[in-house]
Swiss-Prot record:
InterPro entries named among the record's database cross-references: Chloro/Mito_RNA_Process, Homing_endonucl, LAGLIDADG_dom
Homology family: Belongs to the LAGLIDADG endonuclease family.
Enzyme class: hydrolase
Annotated organism of origin: Zygosaccharomyces bisporus
Protein name: Probable intron-encoded endonuclease I-ZbiI
Amino acid sequence: MMKFIKKEQIKNLGPNSKLLKQYKSQLTNLTSEQLEIGVGLLLGDAYIRSRDNGKTNCIQFEWKNKAYIDHICLKFDEWVLSPPHKKMRINHLGNEVITWGAQTFKHEAFNELSKLFIINNKKHIINNLIEDYVTPKSLAYWFMDDGGKWDYNKGSMNKSIVLNTQCFTIDEVNSLINGLNTKFKLNCSMKFNKNKPIIYIPHNSYNIYYELISPYIITEMRYKLPSYEGTSKDYNKIH
């Protein structure tokens, strides 16, 4: 019987290391939590890709918030071999932008997520994705990844939320909206940002949405939420 190999044993080994290959081979599937989170991340900015025609896949992450990417790497700990790396660039306004990048190693375990989001090497939304695969935890990671306030004016009482879905087609965003409204009893609609579709969750749906996602929003990302009048017993609970 092959001895179980711990992640600490394979740090700094080359890609062709026998021990590294044994470590990868002992992993089989993502956990149910990793699948839930993965769906939420891929609805946002994370990307899944294959370099061997779909035999294996890996997920790539890049965000400005260091605490958030550290949290994600911890959630996918056994699949991430290197810590987040700092990336610097100059934007179109001439300002320095710092982000943090990380990725999992390629593995068959990520193929399940690839089947949900990738068609002909491009990101897509399958029919009934929300109804069949999205949970409140998925919603929370989708929001942390690519959501925000509709109204950023200081002191605003507007609790409307936006999910930035500009990378998807109008039909795909409509499918997401229908799923959200049906499964989670929200009242979402489509709006446009620079002629690209986004999902608008109105003020009157916010309390429902908040109670769904609040248990899973990490402390460092709660600034993205509008103020909330009420309490949640799970406010600081992180799964």
